[in-house]
Amino acid sequence: MAEKHLKKCSTSLIIREMQIKTTLRFYLTSVRMTKIINSGDSRCWWGCGERGTLLHCWWDCNLVQPLWKSVWWFLRKLDIVLLEDPAIPLLGIYPENVSTCNKDTCSTMFIAALFIVARIWKEPRCPSTEEWLQKMWYIYTMEYYSAIKNNEFMGFLGKWMDLEDIILSELTKSQKNSHYVHSLISGL
């Protein structure tokens, strides 16, 4: 099931690369590094003191949980109801009752969150919702231009119409000005 999810996630190679790396356990955790170099310290790199397993570093750690709580908060604003299960964002294994359109929207949101977690992989700080929103906007912009180029604008609209409004409402005016953020769908 995860392989099917990998093949249809996005046309963007950067997004597909991130999804492949997380699904295939590309990132080395402190537990795996301890086994490789025979050191005794397998604690989480985020600095929480827990054992740094793959699931802990990507999902369970107290420094990563606020980001995932924000992602699920956005899902609720979109009226998408999902269990807070790490198999969904990390492996792309969705419950059977989730529509394809919702899966596409969720996958994009999850991949943006995974990007942010991976970017600060060994830094002892919490990934911020602002960074996540900026990554979402970057993905949105790239998919917009890809949809125009490939004449697939209707699929783009289905995926991004509601999500664009929520992202724009959460970004502050200074963020919008500094990152040149404006609606690509409505042209405002």
PLM ranges: what are they?
Residues 1-188:
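Family-specific functional microsites
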